[in-house]
UniProtKB/Swiss-Prot annotation:
Residues annotated for [4Fe-4S] cluster 2 binding in this entry: 116, 119, 122, 156
GO molecular function: 4 iron, 4 sulfur cluster binding; electron transfer activity; metal ion binding
Organism annotation: Buchnera aphidicola subsp. Baizongia pistaciae (strain Bp)
Region (Hydrophobic) location: 1-23
The family this protein is said to belong to: Belongs to the 4Fe4S bacterial-type ferredoxin family. RnfB subfamily.
EC number: 7.-.-.-
Cofactors, names only: [4Fe-4S] cluster
HAMAP family linked: RsxB_RnfB
Cofactor remark from the record: Binds 3 [4Fe-4S] clusters.
Gene name, Swiss-Prot/TrEMBL: rnfB
Protein's GO biological process: electron transport chain
Protein known as: Ion-translocating oxidoreductase complex subunit B
Amino acid sequence: MIISIIIFSILSFILGVIVSLVSCFCKVKSNLSLINDIDELLPQMQCAQCGYPGCYAYSQAIVDGNENIYKCIPGGKEVVLKLENLLNKSDHRGNFLESLEDSVTYSIVEIDENNCVGCSKCRLVCPVDAVVGTYNFRHTVLIDSCTGCNLCIPLCPTNCIKKKIMFYE
């Protein structure tokens, strides 16, 4: 009788450990799915205006509970509403959606081509290839491609790269 109780207790403990491990692995998979769903809703500008290096990192922070869903400036009201719907959250920030005017700003960079020496440092560091030009010739920025990461600004030896504030329309 005692032996059967001991065997039953050991088997119950082992089964409990197995169930715990399986539930942990299933939770990770559902988190990855949720991270990917959130990432698909974001505009994929990799602008870092939310404080994260890219949209995927911001998605991970949202799922981990370390960040709120209201930091994607380029996404505007549309993305906030989609994220609220996906995560079943309502606007806990009061008038946040009303404060998102139609003229929300974002930043890009602009090169003063008259002062550009063509060193190509900006072109080489640009993560989205928004800077075009060849070595020893003037460079320019493709405004539609620039994400405003500003990685190129400190590298310019002539300080001809400036941040420019744009408005969403």
